[in-house]
C-alpha cells in the first residue's frame, strides 16, 4: 500500500482496539550521538545571544510553546480535571460574580453516542481484521520502518552537528557578524611566531566546513531517495485512473444504446397504438355531433355582416351567445376547439377594430379647428364606442386618448409658432430652417403674443377634453347604476322563484334572453316569463338574424330597465344609451369606480400635458438666456400671463398643475440672480472707481429720499423739465439731517429701491430678493472697509493717503445706509409670510456690522490723534516761552482735524469724537509730566504747564461746536497720596 511508504519517522503499533492507535514517542527511541567539537569560537564582540538562541529545525521541534494546553489559559480554565480547591481561582480575588459557568451545548449539533457508530463498526471490523492479518504476514515492512526510523534518527543526529547559524533563514555572509562567526579571522594572526598554529586552525576549519557540507548533501540525497518511490507510484496510479475512465465511458455509451433500443421496441409502438385509438374515439364523437356543428356554422358570416355596418355591439352579442351554447350544450367536445379559438380571434379582431375606431375618433375630435364652437364631436358615436369597449373590458382606451392629447398639444404649439413666424417679415425662413431657431428670432413683444396665443388655444383644448371626458364619465356611471339595479332585480327574482321551486331554470332562461340578440333587450320588454322562455329558445337557432338597431325608436320599449334609464340618462339620445346599458358589461363595481377615477385623473393629466408643453416651449426660448435678459417690467408681464393661465387651467380641471409654476419659479430665481449680479457688479465698479470725496447731490436723488420719507418705497418718475432747472445740492437732506455722501452711496440707495420695487411686482421672489439684498449690503460694508480702513483705495484708484476726511465721509455714508435699514426691513416684513419672519434677522446682523464699522472708523480717527500726541508730547519740555511749540503744534493739528470732519459728521458725533481725543491727550500729557517729575505744587514748572494747558483748552473750546465741551483737565496731575 502507498501508506506503507510514508516518510513519517513515527511507527504505528497495533492495538487490541480496532479504531484507536497509540502514537509512539520518538524521543524514547533516539540515541544521543556526541557531536564534533565546535571549531568556530564565538567573538566576544559579536552578538552572542543571536548565535546561541537561533532556531533549529531539528532540536527545536519538541520545545514547549505558548500554544500547548498546559500554558494556554482557556485550556487551563476548561480542564475537566480541575480540582475543587481551584474553583475559587477568580472569586477569591475578584468577587463572587466570577464563577465557573457550564457552557450550554449548541442545539444545532445532535448528541452523538456510541450507538451511532455501531453500523460503521460492524462494516469496518472485518476489513480491519484482514488488514491486521496482512500486517502480520509482511514483517519486512516493519523492518523497513525500523530501518527508516533509524536512518531518520541518524540523519537528525548528523544535522545536529551543523551549527544553528547555518540554519538561520537570514544567513548571509555579507553580514559582518555572520562572516566573523563562520570565519573568525581574528584568530589567524601570522605575527609573533604563531603561523604554524594558525595554519593548522585554518586547515581544521576547512575540514569542518567540508564535513558540514557532506552532511547536508547526504541528507538531501536521502530525502530525495525516500520520496522517489511515492512519486513513481503516483504516476502509475494516474495511468491506471485514465484507463478506468476510458473503460467506464465505453460502458456508459453501450448502456445508453441498449436503453434507446428498448425504448424504441417496447414504448414507441404502444404509444402509437394509443394515439390511433384516441383519434378513432374523436372521430366517433365528431360524427355524433355533426348536426350540432351545423347549428353554429352560420355564426361567422353573420358577424361579418354586422361588422360591415359597424354594429360592433351586435357582433359581440352574437359571439357571446355562440360561446355560451358551446359551453353549455356542446361542452367537452374537443373537435370544437377551433371554433372557440376562431370566435376568440374574431372577438379580438372586433376589439382591435373598436380601439382603432376610438383612436380615429379621438384624433378627429382633438385635431378639429379650435375655432369650432361644438364641444363634443359625434356624441352618439362616442357613446356607442365607449359601451362596446366597456363590454369587452378594454379599459385601456383612456391611454389612447391620453396619447392623442400629447400629440395634439405638441401640434398646437407647432401650429401657433408657424403662424406667428409666417406673420413676421424680419425672419427669412429660407435661411433659418429650423422652427425652433425661427422662434428664437422673435423679439419679446412678438414672442409674448405667441405665448398668449398658445395659452388661449390650450384653454380651448382643455375645455373640449373636459366635455368629452364628461360624456365618457356619464356612460361609466350609467353602467354602474345599471349593475346595481340588475343586482337588485336578480335578488327579487330569486326570492320569487324560490317559492315556485324552479329558480334555477328561470334564471338560466333569463340570462340566455338577456345575452342573445339586441332586439331582445328592448323589443320584448313586456313579455311574460313564459314568453321569455319561448324567445330564448327561438334565439338559440343560428338561422335567426339579429334585429336591426333601428328598432330603437319603437314605442314598445317599455321594460323595467329601459324605463328606469329614460329618467336617469343624460344622453342626447336616451334610446341609444338604454340599449347599451341593458347589456351585461361583466364589470364589477370596483372596476367601474376605478375607471371613473381614471377619467378624472386623465383630465388632470391633460392639464399637466399643457403645462409640460408650455414649460418646454419656455425652455427652448430660454436656451440663449433670453428670459434672463428681460427687464423687470417684461418679466413681470410674463409672470402675470403665466399665473393667469395656471388659474384658468385649475378652474377647468379642478387641480393645480405644478410644472409651469415650477418653471416660472425657476425663471424667477434666474431673473433674481441676474438682477442681483448686475447690480452687484455695478456696485463693485463704482466702489473700485470711488475716490471718497464729497459728491454733489442731484435733485432726482433728493426727490427719491423725500419719497422715502413719505413712506412710499418706489422709484419716482422722472420730470425732465423740472430736473434741468434745479441745481445739485452739496448735501443730502434726510428728515432734517444733512448727509455728506459719495456718489456710490447715492446709486446704492437707488439700487436698494429697485430691489424693493421688484418685490412688489413679483411677490414670489420676496425671500430670494431679501437674501440678495442682504448680500449686497454686506458687500458694500466689507468692500468699503477694505478700501478706506484697509487703505485699499491707495492701490485701486491711486489715492496718495487715506485722510481723516475720507474716513469721516465713509462713516457718514454708512450712517445713511443704517438709517434706511429699518425702512427696508418693514417693507419686506409686510410681504413675507409669517413662517419666514426669521429671515428678517439678516437685517439685524447687517445693522450690527455697520455699527461696528462706524465704531472702527471713529477708533481710527482717535488712533491718528493718539499717535500724534505720543510723538509730540514725548518731546515736551517744561520751559519758557509759553505757550510752548509742542502745544502750538497740538492745537494746530486739532484745528485741522476739526475742519476736516465738522462739515461731514453731525455735531453730537463730533463732540463725542473730540472727547475721546481729549482723553487720549490727557493720558499722554499725564505720562509725560510724570516722566518730568512735574507735580501740581504751584511751583514755576507747574505754572508753565498750567499756561500751556490753558492755551490748549482755549483753542479747543474756540472750535465750532466744542464751546461747551467738558475737558476736565485736572486729570493730568497725579493724585496726592
Swiss-Prot record:
Record carries keyword Acetylation: no
Region annotation Disordered: where it falls in the sequence: 535-575
Residue(s) carrying Phosphoserine: 8
Localisation: Golgi apparatus, trans-Golgi network; Membrane
Coiled coil ranges: 240-260, 480-507, 582-603
GO terms, biological process: apoptotic DNA fragmentation; astrocyte differentiation; cellular response to progesterone stimulus; gene expression; Golgi to vacuole transport; homeostasis of number of cells within a tissue; in utero embryonic development; intracellular calcium ion homeostasis
Biased composition annotated in UniProt, kind: Polar residues: 535-552
Gene Ontology CC entries for this record: cytosol; GARP complex; Golgi apparatus; membrane; mitochondrion; nucleoplasm; perinuclear region of cytoplasm; synapse
Family membership: Belongs to the VPS54 family.
Protein name as it appears in the record: Vacuolar protein sorting-associated protein 54
Gene this chain is encoded by: VPS54
Amino acid at each position: 500500500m502507498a501508506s506503507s511508504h510514508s516518510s513519517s519517522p513515527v511507527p504505528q503499533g497495533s492495538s487490541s482496539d480496532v479504531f484507536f492507535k497509540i502514537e509512539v514517542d520518538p524521543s524514547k527511541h533516539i540515541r544521543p550521538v556526541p557531536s564534533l567539537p565546535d571549531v568556530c569560537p564565538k567573538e566576544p564582540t559579536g552578538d552572542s545571544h543571536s548565535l546561541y538562541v537561533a532556531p533549529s529545525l531539528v532540536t527545536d521541534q519538541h520545545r514547549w510553546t505558548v500554544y500547548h494546553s498546559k500554558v494556554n489559559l482557556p485550556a487551563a480554565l476548561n480542564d475537566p480535571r480541575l480540582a475543587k480547591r481551584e474553583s475559587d481561582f477568580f472569586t477569591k480575588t475578584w468577587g463572587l460574580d466570577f464563577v465557573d459557568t457550564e457552557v450550554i451545548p449548541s442545539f444545532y449539533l445532535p448528541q452523538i453516542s456510541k450507538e451511532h457508530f455501531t453500523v460503521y463498526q460492524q462494516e469496518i471490523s472485518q476489513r480491519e481484521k484482514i488488514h491486521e492479518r496482512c500486517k502480520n504476514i509482511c514483517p519486512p515492512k516493519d523492518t523497513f520502518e525500523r530501518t527508516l526510523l533509524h536512518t531518520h534518527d541518524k540523519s537528525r543526529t548528523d544535522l545536529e552537528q551543523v551549527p544553528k547559524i547555518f540554519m538561520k533563514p537570514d544567513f548571509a555572509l555579507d553580514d559582518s557578524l555572520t562572516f566573523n562567526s563562520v570565519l573568525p579571522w581574528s584568530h589567524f594572526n601570522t605575527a609573533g611566531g604563531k603561523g604554524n598554529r594558525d595554519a593548522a586552525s585554518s586547515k581544521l576549519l576547512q575540514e569542518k566546513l567540508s564535513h558540514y557540507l557532506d552532511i547536508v548533501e547526504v541528507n538531501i540525497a536521502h530525502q530525495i531517495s525516500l520520496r522517489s518511490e511515492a512519486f513513481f507510484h503516483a504516476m502509475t496510479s494516474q495511468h491506471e485512473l485514465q484507463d478506468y475512465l476510458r473503460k467506464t465511458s465505453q460502458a456508459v455509451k453501450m448502456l445508453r444504446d441498449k436503453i434507446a433500443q428498448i425504448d424504441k421496441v417496447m414504448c414507441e409502438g404502444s404509444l402509437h397504438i394509443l394515439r390511433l385509438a384516441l383519434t378513432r374515439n374523436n372521430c366517433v364523437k365528431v360524427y355524433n355531433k355533426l348536426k350540432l356543428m351545423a347549428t353554429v356554422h352560420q355564426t361567422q358570416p353573420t358577424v361579418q355582416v354586422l361588422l360591415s355596418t359597424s354594429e360592433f355591439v351586435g357582433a359581440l352579442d352574437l359571439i357571446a351567445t355562440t360561446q355560451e351554447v358551446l359551453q353549455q350544450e356542446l361542452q367537452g367536445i374537443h373537435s370544437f376547439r377551433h371554433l372557440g379559438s376562431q370566435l376568440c380571434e374574431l372577438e379580438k379582431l372586433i376589439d382591435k377594430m373598436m380601439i382603432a375606431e376610438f383612436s380615429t375618433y379621438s384624433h378627429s375630435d382633438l385635431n378639429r379647428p379650435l375655432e369650432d364652437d361644438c364641444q363634443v364631436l359625434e356624441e352618439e358615436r362616442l357613446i356607442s364606442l365607449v359601451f362596446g369597449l366597456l363590454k369587452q373590458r378594454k379599459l385601456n382606451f383612456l391611454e389612447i386618448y391620453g396619447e392623442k392629447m400629447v400629440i395634439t398639444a405638441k401640434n398646437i404649439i407647432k401650429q401657433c409658432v408657424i403662424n406667428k413666424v409666417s406673420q413676421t417679415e424680419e425672419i427669412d425662413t429660407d435661411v433659418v430652417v429650423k422652427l425652433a431657431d425661427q422662434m428664437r428670432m422673435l423679439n419679446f413683444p412678438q414672442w409674448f403674443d405667441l405665448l398668449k396665443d398658445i395659452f388661449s388655444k390650450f384653454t380651448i383644448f382643455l375645455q373640449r377634453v373636459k366635455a368629452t371626458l364628461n360624456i365618457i364619465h356619464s356612460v361609466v356611471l350609467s353602467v354602474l347604476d345599471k349593475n346595481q339595479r340588475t343586482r337588485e332585480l336578480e335578488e327579487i327574482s330569486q326570492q320569487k322563484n324560490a317559492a315556485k321551486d324552479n329558480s334555477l331554470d328561470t334564471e338560466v332562461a333569463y340570462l340566455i334572453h338577456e345575452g342573445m340578440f339586441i332586439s331582445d333587450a328592448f323589443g320584448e320588454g313586456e313579455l311574460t316569463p313564459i314568453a321569455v322562455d319561448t324567445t330564448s329558445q327561438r334565439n338559440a337557432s343560428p338561422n335567426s338574424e339579429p334585429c336591426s338597431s333601428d328598432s330603437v325608436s319603437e314605442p314598445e320599449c317599455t321594460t323595467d330597465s329601459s324605463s328606469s334609464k329614460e329618467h336617469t340618462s343624460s344622453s342626447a339620445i336616451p334610446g341609444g344609451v338604454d340599449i347599451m346599458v341593458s347589456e351585461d358589461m361583466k364589470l364589477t363595481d370596483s372596476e367601474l369606480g376605478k375607471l371613473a377615477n381614471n377619467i378624472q385623473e386623465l383630465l388632470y393629466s391633460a392639464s399637466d400635458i399643457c403645462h409640460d408643453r408650455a414649460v418646454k416651449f419656455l425652455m427652448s426660448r430660454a436656451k440663449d438666456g433670453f428670459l434672463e435678459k428681460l427687464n423687470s417690467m417684461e418679466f413681470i408681464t410674463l409672470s402675470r400671463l403665466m399665473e393667469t393661465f395656471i388659474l384658468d387651467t385649475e378652474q377647468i380641471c379642478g387641480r393645480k398643475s405644478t410644472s409651469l409654476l415650477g418653471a416660472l419659479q425657476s425663471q424667477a430665481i434666474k431673473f433674481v440672480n441676474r438682477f442681483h449680479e448686475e447690480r452687484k457688479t455695478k456696485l463693485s465698479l463704482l466702489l473700485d472707481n470711488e475716490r471718497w470725496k464729497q459728491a454733489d447731490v442731484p435733485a432726482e436723488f433728493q426727490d427719491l429720499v423725500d419719497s422715502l420719507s413719505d413712506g412710499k418705497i418706489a422709484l419716482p418718475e422722472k420730470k425732465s423739465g423740472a430736473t434741468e432747472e434745479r441745481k445739485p445740492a452739496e448735501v443730502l437732506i434726510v428728515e432734517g439731517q444733512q448727509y455728506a455722501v459719495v456718489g456710490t452711496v447715492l446709486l446704492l440707495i437707488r439700487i436698494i429701491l429697485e430691489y424693493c420695487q421688484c418685490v412688489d411686482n413679483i411677490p414670489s421672489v420676496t425671500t430670494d430678493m431679501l437674501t440678495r439684498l442682504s448680500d449686497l449690503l454686506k458687500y458694500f460694508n466689507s468692500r468699503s472697509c477694505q478700501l478706506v480702513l484697509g487703505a485699499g483705495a491707495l492701490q485701486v484708484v491711486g489715492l496718495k493717503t487715506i485722510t481723516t476726511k475720507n474716513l469721516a465721509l465713509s462713516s457718514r455714508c454708512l450712517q445713511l445706509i443704517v438709517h434706511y435699514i429699518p425702512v427696508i426691513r418693514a417693507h419686506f416684513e409686510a410681504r413675507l409670510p409669517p413662517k419666514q419672519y426669521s429671515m428678517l434677522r439678516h437685517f439685524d446682523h447687517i445693522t450690527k456690522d455697520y455699527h461696528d464699522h462706524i465704531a472702527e472708523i471713529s477708533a481710527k480717527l482717535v488712533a491718528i490723534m493718539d499717535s500724534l500726541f505720543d510723538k509730540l508730547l514725548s518731546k515736551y519740555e517744561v520751559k519758557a516761552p509759553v505757550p510752548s511749540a509742542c502745544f502750538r503744534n497740538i492745537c494746530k493739528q486739532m484745528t485741522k482735524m476739526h475742519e476736516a470732519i465738522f462739515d461731514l459728521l453731525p455735531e453730537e458725533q463730533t463732540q463725542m469724537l473730540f472727547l475721546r481725543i481729549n482723553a487720549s491727550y490727557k493720558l499722554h500729557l499725564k505720562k509725560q509730566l510724570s516722566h518730568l517729575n512735574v507735580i501740581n505744587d504751584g511751583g514755576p514748572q507747574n505754572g508753565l504747564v498750567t499756561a500751556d494747558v490753558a492755551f490748549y483748552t482755549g483753542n479747543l473750546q474756540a472750535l465750532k461746536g466744542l464751546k461747551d465741551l467738558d475737558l476736565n483737565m485736572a486729570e493730568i496731575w497725579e493724585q496726592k497720596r
